[in-house]
Amino acid sequence: MATKSKYQDKQIEALLNDLIVTLEKHKAPVDLSLMALGNMITNILVTNVQSPQQREVLAEAFSSALKNSLKSAK
C-alpha cells in the first residue's frame, strides 16, 4: 500500500503471507475478511496510540493510502 516504507519488502511480504494464510485457513469470505482486518486496525490504533486525535489522523492516512492503492491497482 505504501509507496515508501521503512520496512523491507521481505518483512511486509512475510506478514502479508501469514495474514492471507490465516484468512484462507478459516475460509473467510471477502466481507468477513474485511471485517476482521478492520477490527484488527481499530485494535492496533486503540491499544498503541493514546491520543484520540492522533488515532483519527492515522486512520485518515490509512484510508487515503488504501484508496490510492486501489486506484493504482486498476
Curated annotation (Swiss-Prot):
Signal peptide: none annotated. InterPro entries: UPF0352, YejL_sf. Pfam families: DUF1414. Belongs to the UPF0352 family. NCBIfam families: PRK13689.1 (NF010242). This is UPF0352 protein HAPS_0210. It comes from Glaesserella parasuis serovar 5 (strain SH0165).
